[in-house]
């Protein structure tokens, strides 16, 4: 939370919140466009450059505080559906996150640290590992997992909402 408040730009704050509450990789978050969002359900469908869904990912979600920041920073209705939300170079985000961490004598925060924090936080909130893996784009390819695990968007959203992850609370 303290690192978030040290960031100078709303764009960087929005990126930090998305990385921390969705479990997505830096490249996935920084490649997002308005067309990747399901705004009604706070869902996000990251895509690779070729337009394919990343790895085996169905979708991930983001928290209410992230939603508020996104709507504060971006007017999704006025943006082109394929216009990137984040315009800075990826290394700029990593560098500025680390600088903000240093200002408050915090552990060095990087996009990877935020992804690890997401996994640990969701686990501490009682979310099963297989669902955390799904949010992070690591669904199993095993027959057992494919046929007996419910990775529907509705089920994943319910699990995410029940966990109640937040950075700013």
Label every PLM stretch briefly.
Residues 1-26, 115:
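Basic, Lys/Arg- and aromatic-enriched nucleic-acid-binding interface segment
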Residues 11, 25, 57-60, 71-75, ...:
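Short, cationic motifs built from Arg/Lys/His that form the positively charged side of catalytic pockets
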Residues 22, 31-70:
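Conserved tyrosine-mediated DNA breakage-rejoining catalytic core shared by Y-recombinases
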Residues 17, 21, 113-139:
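C-terminal catalytic core of tyrosine-transesterase DNA break-rejoin enzymes
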Residues 37-39, 108, 127-147:
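Short, polar N-cap/turn motifs at the start of nucleic acid-interacting alpha helices
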Residues 63-107, 118:
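Active-site/catalytic core of tyrosine-dependent DNA strand-transfer enzymes
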Residues 52, 136-165:
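Catalytic-site neighborhood detector that most strongly recognizes the C-terminal catalytic loop/helix
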Residues 5, 10, 89-92, 108-113:
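N-terminal core-binding DNA-recognition domain of tyrosine site-specific recombinases/integrases
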